[in-house]
Amino acid sequence: VLFRSPEETLYFANPGKEENFKPEFYFHWEDFNNTVIRDWRRIVSDLLSIPMAHQLIGYYTIADDKDKTLKVLRSYQYFAASKISDITHKTNWDTHQHRGGYVWHTTGSGKTMTSFKSAQLIANSGDADKVVFLLDRIELSVQSLDEYRGFAGEDEAIQDTQNTAILLSKLKSTDNDDRLIVTSIQKMSNIKAGKDISQDDIDRS
């Protein structure tokens, strides 16, 4: 849903019942540098054009099962997830010259949703065989797993890893349900390359 007044434009996902309309889910559309776009012509060209409008609705909304609310990504979340997915698609993994990257989000800015949407786009595109949410604290992995499962669609599985052996089995698995994995640095660090997992395992997964 998009609302336009002479002074500003707001967009939000339709929450259904009147009591579910909440101002915290009303967003301004901003450009890549987080500058609010107020000119209606820019709104039309940047947000309401085809295929952008279709992409925002089809790929950048999340039906959060935890609070039963349809949510749409804020503009900076959209740019982050879109950029990550695009770079992953363009990367030639056979050259082994790819680099890491990071997304800078502040507290309360929707990091979990951004990371989930990025992983979902990559997994659904087939550009990566595995997407691993690697977290630095075990308690954080439990919290994130709960949130990711709330974001996931009915046909998507978010895999937990209670121990290193289960993590190893998920990494080696060729099952499509094992593409999205949540685990901790501690469990990942227990896996020894060449001993627990071989290049053949990696090639098969």
Which stretches of residues belong to each language-model region?
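Conserved helicase motor
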Residues: 138, 160-170, 184-190
